[in-house]
Each structure stands twice: as C-alpha cells, then as structure tokens.
C-alpha cells in the first residue's frame, strides 16, 4: 500500500498464518534540507495484549511474538523492495524503528538478538528507535542493551499527566503508574546518559486542554526527558477525534518556553 507522501505499508504473513505490518517512510525535508536517512518501522509481535484505547492492534488481541529472524526479515524484505524502486536512496543510512504492532519489551529476548545482530552486521544502520508503553521492570534491561550498542533511542508513551485518565487510555498504567514509570525512565537516563523521549498523543477533548499542558510541564524534568507530540490518527473504529495542528503547536511552544525539548 503506497501513500501519497511516498510511504509504503507492507503486510507480511508468517508460516503460522499470522499477519504483521512494516512501513517504509522518509521525513519531510527541514529548511529545504533532505534528511540523510530513511526509516523502516517494523512490528515486534503479531497482535498486542496492551489494549491501549486508541490503537487498532489491541483489538486483535495477542497472537504470537515475532522471532528475531522474522524481524530481520521485515527489514531485509522492505530494503529489497526499496532497492528495486529507489536504488539511490536505498543505499543511504536508515533507522530500524520498532514502533509497529506489539509491545517490544514484552518480546525482549528477540528484540535483544535483533538489535545486536542488525547493529553488528549492517553498516548502513543509523539508529534503532524503540517505543514502549512502559513495562517498568524491563526498562533496566533496555538500558543494558543501549550501553552495549549505543544506537537505541527510547520512546515511552505518556498520554496524560493524571493517573486515572492515563489508566483509561492505557490500562498498563494500573500496573505501573506515572510516578513509577518516570522514575524508571530517569534511572534509564542516568544509566545510559541518553534522555528518554515521552510520546504524548493529543486527542481532542481528552488530553489537549490548557490544564493538561500546565500539569504536563510540571511533571517533566527537562534534565531527563524530551517530548514528542503526536496527533491522534482516526482509525476504522474511531473512538476519538484528531485535534487541529494548532493545538500541537501551542503545546510545542509552551513546552519549549519551559526548557523542555519538544517536537511535533
């Protein structure tokens, strides 16, 4: 499936009949300067058991972990296809983004093998961004992996500054609340000297008020964290509404004015 912006979605089926997705994309040029690399976003699980309220994958339930070899296949198959259609750009550096279907930390053994294998064998690999809902006991293991490889960028979902609301959006918060999550992420930064990026998805009428913004600013220590602002994407069974870009810009400007590194 090819989008108007040039990104491509791939759907893979394994020998057990499970489906997963991968996406090839490039970021838009900044100040008319093209980015030097492209991105391949891969899945780490067939389905997911986290059941985040905004995510279609959670509706599938959990089926199976991808093996590290299957994750490597995702990268290799996408790259082979890109070489056919865009050989010049396919030879540049790329990032292997683990932000597709599944919760990576719940498949840590295979994530470990995948990251280690790819990092040691592919000189074109630039970074490995990994996004998690925040499985607190496993964050120290990711810190150890980052210290070995040094190319991991850790993203953690935080979609409300309030525990009660965050538990409604992301049920995992009932097990690991905001305080314990941020504490583990602060320790990750201290152990790796790499800041954690908090992904805050803006949902109209849910977490985009001025009060949310003010309390989010109070919650975030810029010494340990950066922020990535996302806009909710309408799904086939949309429960929420995508906000206008102006809302994200307001959040972005206020965060920056308070010394917090932020991007949209």
PLM features: residue spans?
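Flexible, acidic/Gly-rich N-terminal and inter-domain linker regions that tether
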Residues: 1-38
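Short linear Ser/Thr-Pro motifs
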Residues: 1-3, 29, 43-44, 131, ...
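Non-catalytic surface loops within mature trypsin-like serine protease
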Residues: 14-16, 26, 46, 158-160, ...
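Conserved AdoMet/S-adenosylmethionine-binding subsite of the radical SAM
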Residues: 79-254, 258
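Acidic-residue sensor for enzyme active/binding pockets
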Residues: 21, 74, 103
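Canonical Radical SAM [4Fe-4S] cluster-binding loop centered on the CxxxCxxC motif
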Residues: 26-73, 77
């Amino acid at each position: 499936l090819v989008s108007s912006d040039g990104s491509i979605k791939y759907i893979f089926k394994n020998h057990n009949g499970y489906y997963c997705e991968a996406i090839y994309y490039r970021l838009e040029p900044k100040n008319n300067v093209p980015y030097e690399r492209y991105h391949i976003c891969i899945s780490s699980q067939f389905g997911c058991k986290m059941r985040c309220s905004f995510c279609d994958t959670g509706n599938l339930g959990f089926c199976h972990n991808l093996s590290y070899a299957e994750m490597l296949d995702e990268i290799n198959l996408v790259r082979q296809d890109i070489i056919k259609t865009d050989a010049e750009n396919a030879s540049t550096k790329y990032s292997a983004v683990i932000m597709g279907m599944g919760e990576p930390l719940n498949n840590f053994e295979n994530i470990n093998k995948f990251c280690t294998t790819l990092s040691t064998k592919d000189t074109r690999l630039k970074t490995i961004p990994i996004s998690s809902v925040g499985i607190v006991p496993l964050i120290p293991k990711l810190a150890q992996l980052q210290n070995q490889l040094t190319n991991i960028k850790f993203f953690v979902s935080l979609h409300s500054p309030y525990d009660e609301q965050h538990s409604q959006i992301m049920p995992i918060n009932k097990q690991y609340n905001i305080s314990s999550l941020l504490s583990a992420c602060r320790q990750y930064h201290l152990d790796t000297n790499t800041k954690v990026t908090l992904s805050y998805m803006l949902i109209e009428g849910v977490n985009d008020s001025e009060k949310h913004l003010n309390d989010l600013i109070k919650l975030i220590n810029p010494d340990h964290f950066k922020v990535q602002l996302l806009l909710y994407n309408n799904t086939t069974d949309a429960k929420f509404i995508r906000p206008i870009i102006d809302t994200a810009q307001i959040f972005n400007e206020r965060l920056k004015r308070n010394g917090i590194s932020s991007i949209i």
